[in-house]
């Protein structure tokens, strides 16, 4: 594997005293390729800094999809739920979200549990109807957790939300790079599943 070779070579050069870590640079063609290097550098204790880009797991599309997985697994993470409630756009405004958050705080329940009770929040009115499809989607995905793999679940999230279709419709270089990042995330999940006896 290329990333492993590069990590070993950098460590050997630093150990021999020929170079310092700061003397080394890795160039790659697409941002999606950075993940492999980042992971090898972390495992190999090689300090690194990404120049002209963003850490793989800090990219919007990756954070969005991981927030979906986190919400499906455990909807008690209010930040994850709030991150994805309008991804893709569902027309749920800030006022509605604040009213749900107020209800959750008053009832001492999670934001997601408050979303599930949208019909019972008097201040929401017709806005409650916009919340239902999101809650239904998460509940359907939660029901599949025990019967499909994480990679299949991730693919279903992408398909059902239309995440990649929206990016394809943008037809920009940035959108293409984001699709490559999503493909790289799927590859990472598949590799994890293949390497683990009981992947979760």
What positions do the PLM features span?
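Helicase P-loop NTPase motor core
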Residues: 1-47, 70-74, 106, 128, ...
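Conserved short internal alpha-helix adjacent to the catalytic or cofactor-binding core
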Residues: 43-46, 54, 58-88
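Conserved helicase motor
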Residues: 28-31, 51-59, 185
